C-alpha cells in the first residue's frame, strides 16, 4: 500500500513538471524574480556577456514557471543531483525585486554581485552564501539554516537591512546580525537604524 502511494506521488509530480520551462523572455521584459529552490545545491551567476536569456544548467526539474504581464518571473525548481546553476544575464536593465527562498534542505551560493531595488533571501534549513549585494532594501530570513551575506561597501550607508531567525545565524560583512542559542538567548530580529544627522543607515 505504501509503495503504491509513493508511486502515485512520483507520477503526479512527474506530470506536474512536464510542460514547464524557463521563460524565453528577453531580459528587458523581466523586472522581478521570485524563485523557490528545493532539495539540493544551487548556484547563481549574475554575469555580463551571457546574452539576453536566462540559463539553467544541471540535473533539475522545474515544477512551475510563469511570467506575468507586469514583468515578474516566478519559478519553483528542484535540484535532483549535483549542482544546478542559474545564470542571470547582466545588462542595463535594473530589477525591481529579487526574492529567493531556499526550502527542503536547498543550499545556495550566489557568486557575483546581485543588484535590485529590493532583495529578499531566505533559507529553511540549508546554507545560503552571497559574495555581494546591492539594493535599497535587503531582507534576510532563516529558520534553522545559515545565511552569510556581503554588502558592497558603496551600498553600506544607503541600505535598509532587516534580518530574522528562528535559530540559525545570519551574518553580513562578517558581522553577526541575529542568532538564537539552544537556551533561547540571543537576538531574533535586526533592523538597522537610520541616522538623521548623517542621513545614512548604520550596520
Question: At which residue positions do the language-model features occur?
Answer:
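Short, surface-exposed interaction patches in beta-rich subdomains
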Residues: 113, 118, 128-203
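Right-handed parallel beta-helix
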Residues: 98-132
Amino acid at each position: 500500500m505504501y509503495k503504491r502511494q509513493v508511486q502515485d506521488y512520483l507520477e503526479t509530480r512527474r506530470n506536474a513538471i512536464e510542460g514547464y520551462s524557463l521563460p524565453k523572455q528577453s531580459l528587458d521584459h523581466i523586472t522581478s524574480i521570485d524563485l523557490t529552490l528545493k532539495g539540493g545545491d544551487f548556484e547563481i551567476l549574475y554575469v555580463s556577456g551571457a546574452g539576453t536569456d536566462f540559463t539553467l544548467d544541471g540535473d533539475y526539474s522545474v515544477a512551475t514557471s510563469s511570467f506575468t504581464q507586469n514583468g515578474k518571473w516566478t519559478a519553483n525548481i528542484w535540484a535532483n543531483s549535483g549542482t544546478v546553476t542559474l545564470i542571470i544575464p547582466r545588462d542595463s536593465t535594473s530589477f525591481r525585486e529579487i526574492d529567493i527562498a531556499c526550502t527542503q534542505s536547498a543550499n545556495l551560493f550566489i557568486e557575483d554581485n546581485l543588484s535590485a531595488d529590493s532583495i529578499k533571501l531566505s533559507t529553511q534549513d540549508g546554507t545560503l552564501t552571497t559574495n555581494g549585494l546591492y539594493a535599497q532594501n535587503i531582507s534576510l530570513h532563516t529558520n534553522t539554516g545559515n545565511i552569510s551575506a556581503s554588502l558592497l561597501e558603496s551600498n553600506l550607508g544607503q541600505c535598509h537591512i532587516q534580518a530574522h531567525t528562528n535559530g540559525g545565524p545570519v551574518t553580513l560583512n562578517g558581522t553577526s546580525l541575529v542568532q538564537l542559542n539552544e537556551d533561547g538567548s540571543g537576538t531574533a530580529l535586526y533592523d538597522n537604524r537610520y541616522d538623521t544627522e548623517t542621513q545614512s543607515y548604520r550596520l
